[in-house]
Amino acid sequence: MRKAKLLLFLIGLSFYQIGLAQNINFILTSAGTLVNKEDSSDFVVINFEGKSKDEIFEEALKAVTMAYNSPKDIISKVENEMISINGTIPSCTVYRSLGIPIYFGMDYVIKLQFKDGKMRINAPYISRWFADNAPNITPFSGWLKAQSVFKNGKPNPKKQYTIDGIEGSFNNLLNSISASMFNKNKESW
């Protein structure tokens, strides 16, 4: 019984910690760009009350480093000012053509900028879009139009799974990094 109570307490505590982090939610537009769902801006600002920009930078650098297998290959930084993430998500979404699933991946750039008490996450930029069995597809916005992923500027309900895969890949990554920065128990392993 004590173990069950302890387990429930720890689960509740982890949800509380995650709840402290702001939910990051970028959505895909018909132009092939991502924007903040709340206000259609191309960035999200996360507040860190009472923290200096140097402290926030260090926390972000640790969180980003933990999120990748080989961080030195994808992270560029301007000390205490900016972190640039140049990554790849293979098979991030599936598109069905004549019932045949085609898996797509993407290369992307995400920039994090810092001020005292704040971190700005610029909307991810898709720098390369590719099928696992085909060469690069450019421009990404042209592919979205050609495949009717959007109709009249609105998501095509029949292709929503493609949009969800792209948005989910970025939002899950960024929310994981953000939650890691807010997690105060990471040192007690």
Where are these regions (language model features)?
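Bacterial Sec-dependent N-terminal signal peptides
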Residues: 1-24
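Ser/Thr-rich, low-complexity intrinsically disordered terminal regions
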Residues: 21-189
